[in-house]
A protein has these predicted regions:
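Active-site-adjacent structural elements that line small-molecule/cofactor binding pockets in enzymes
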Residues: 1-283
Length: 283
């Protein structure tokens, strides 16, 4: 199982200037990927901006959006922006994408929180058209440079359509930031959908969890603040935070047991020292 680390781009105590340094340290420590959190109505840094900063500060580590709220964006603009991040990184971006579950994140006029599944399916076709270099409507020009590619896609969510969509156009699935026993049934659903779609091999199965090597009370408060708008789900997230070295080791075992290909460990605070502390235990 590979071990990635989250960028604290949505931490309420975030100084945005640390994102490049966080990214450099994570790459040097040997983590497999750097992942962002997707949120708009929160005092953080947009995931696309954090990914761009990480792309410029690193050279080998994978970049992952875990997960970006697709239908909250105008599809053409998002596709172009992501192609730019991927290009700057040298082709290291994997797009984790989902529908979104918080009404306050839908801030763009004309893009409300309804009809999200159909909108995402329509948006995906727009992404592919942009990434394939098709001309924009009313223009003789494509929106991306030559050499742009279709980004690998992983989908997050719990609706049956999520797994069908992932099996149809994606590379796999990313679970929510809850304990492994809650994620295991979703992994099983993804494996089943993959086989039913006639796909070869196995889907990528990624998971997300929070860790804290420092003060557990501070960590818990920060995570609780972030999920305050969805308190029932937030309680499930809180039960899965790994505290200290032994907590992290136990967390790793639990996700290995359910067949996780990569576990993204999200920091509970924006303390740069957490990177090395985690690496000593998890890598």
């Amino acid at each position: 199982m590979k071990i990635g680390i989250g960028i604290p781009n949505q931490g309420s105590d975030l100084d945005p200037k640390i994102i490049p340094e966080w990214s450099r340290r994570a790459e040097a420590a040997g983590f497999s990927s750097l992942a962002t959190a997707g949120r708009i109505a929160y005092p953080g840094v947009m995931d696309t901006v954090a990914l761009a900063a990480a792309a410029g500060a690193t050279s080998t580590i994978e970049l992952f959006s875990g997960v970006l709220i697709g239908p909250a964006w105008p599809a053409t603009l998002l596709a172009k922006e992501l192609a730019g991040v991927d290009g700057v990184s040298g082709g290291r971006l994997t797009l984790g994408i989902g529908l979104g579950g918080r009404a306050d994140d839908f801030v763009v006029d004309g893009l409300p929180m309804n009809g999200l599944g159909q909108r995402l399916d329509d948006d995906l076709q727009t992404y592919f058209d942009v990434w394939d270099g098709k001309e924009f409507e009313g223009s003789p020009n494509p929106g991306v440079p030559a050499g742009a590619r279709r980004l690998p896609l992983l989908f997050g969510g719990a609706a049956p359509a999520t797994f069908e969509r992932a099996a149809r156009v994606g590379e796999g699935y990313v679970g929510a930031a809850v304990p492994a026993p809650y994620v295991a049934p979703a992994f099983d659903q993804m494996r089943t959908a993959w086989k039913q779609a006639g796909r070869d091999g196995d889907p990528q199965l990624r998971a997300i969890a929070y860790f804290a090597m420092g003060d557990p009370e501070v960590a818990r408060r920060k995570v609780e603040e972030y999920y305050a708008v969805t308190p029932e789900f937030g309680q499930a997230v809180l039960t899965g935070i790994a505290y200290g070295p032994e907590g992290v080791r136990e967390l790793l075992r639990s996700f290995e047991d359910i067949g996780t290909d990569e576990l993204i460990l999200n920091p509970s605070t924006a303390d740069l020292d957490e990177i090395e502390r985690l690496a000593e235990v998890a890598l």
